[in-house]
Amino acid sequence: MKKRILMIAALAVLAAGCAELLKVLETVAPAALTEQEVISGLKEALITGAKNSAGRLSLTDGYYSDLAIKVLLPEEAKVIVDNISKIPGGDKLVEDVIIRINRAAEDAAKEVAPVFVSAVTQMTIADGFNILRGEDNAATQYLHSTTYNELYSLYKPKIAVSTEKKIIAGISTKESWETLTGKWNSFAGTLAGRLAGFNTVNTEIDDYLTKKALDGLFMKIAEEELKIRKDVSARVTPLLQKVFGSLDAK
């Protein structure tokens, strides 16, 4: 009888302990993420990343001083740079073009954030969960694959406006590029130029600049995404903390 009483008492204590433990777990364990929270959190992350990236790139030297995304002359123009000393004033002309190209990209970056804000509204619930559980740059890859063409068509006209702006001595980026390539093509097209194996340069500057600027932008957004995924301090809102915090223990 005594043993039975002791056993019953022990079970009662154990049951009480389990009940208390469950209460504690309910208090500290995060609630399961809802579909709406996942979608809202990812949209918030993309918008935050886009705004942060575009904000930095739109500053003076945002592109020019960042060696990872600095927009240089097209590969087709390498021969110009390599042989620029043969053209009077060529060194300064090349640097002026590079500066103006990057200024154009910085100017266009001011308009990028609203484009991304509009684009992320198309994200579905399935997309959201795939991105949340995907690679560290899954959101950036999704955004690139689903919006690049639209962003290009929206971004290129802004680039064109920027390259046509008069910046230094009343000369635009496009005019500087055309002057540079025009001088080179005049030489490359001569008999001496052809015998030397030089080719003319026919790169369309607005197309080239748009692609390079967007590549740089997506690179920076990928960096922002990685911060939000890995760095708790980068999750600047409660929703970001909850959505991406669910990945920390995995």
Language-model features: locations:
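C-terminal motif of bacterial Sec signal peptides marking the signal peptidase cleavage site
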Residues: 14-17
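Bacterial signal peptide processing site
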Residues: 19-22
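Post-signal-peptide N-terminal segment of Sec-exported extracytoplasmic proteins
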Residues: 24-26, 31-72
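Signal peptide-directed extracytoplasmic domains
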Residues: 58-103, 114
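Mid-length scaffold segments of soluble, non-membrane domains
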Residues: 95-165
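A structured, mid-to-C-terminal "fold-capping" secondary-structure block
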Residues: 169-238
